[in-house]
């Protein structure tokens, strides 16, 4: 293994090392850095043919920062509220559309609601222009 390959591998191993734990174990598992092969440390399948190809890409990416449980819960709640608000707005749009736009009592999909609303507004605009 060339010196640069060892340096890249060492940097990769150290970036995954869990420095917060007392026993200084590697990552979340009980495996040691020695059990991690060079090929598996590189994310690209090209790593086997060119040892530095996969690691160069991995070196450029920043490691994912774990979101705290509280932040995830807040983000999830915000997303739920956003989706509820969107569903409410679409429901209101459906109420303004004439019954002829709905299919046999089935609710329109989101995209159908938007397309039919655009079509209906164009029709109303055309009527107003004629007057």
UniProtKB/Swiss-Prot annotation:
This is Mesogenin-1. The lineage of its organism: Eukaryota, Metazoa, Chordata, Craniata, Vertebrata. The gene is msgn1. Residues 63-73 have a biased composition (Basic residues). It comes from Danio rerio (Zebrafish). Transmembrane segments: none annotated. GO terms for biological process: mesoderm development; mesoderm formation; paraxial mesodermal cell differentiation; regulation of transcription by RNA polymerase II; somatic muscle development. Keywords: Developmental protein, Differentiation, DNA-binding, Nucleus, Transcription, Transcription regulation. It comes from the Eukaryota. GO terms for cellular component: nucleus. SMART domains: HLH. Residues 22-79 are annotated as: Disordered. GO terms for molecular function: DNA-binding transcription factor activity, RNA polymerase II-specific; protein dimerization activity; RNA polymerase II cis-regulatory region sequence-specific DNA binding. Disulfide bonds: none annotated. Residues 70-124 form the bHLH domain. It is found in: Nucleus. Involved in specifying the paraxial, but not dorsal, mesoderm. May regulate the expression of T-box transcription factors required for mesoderm formation and differentiation. Residues 27-45 have a biased composition (Low complexity). Coexpression of ntl and spt is required for expression. The keyword Membrane does not apply.
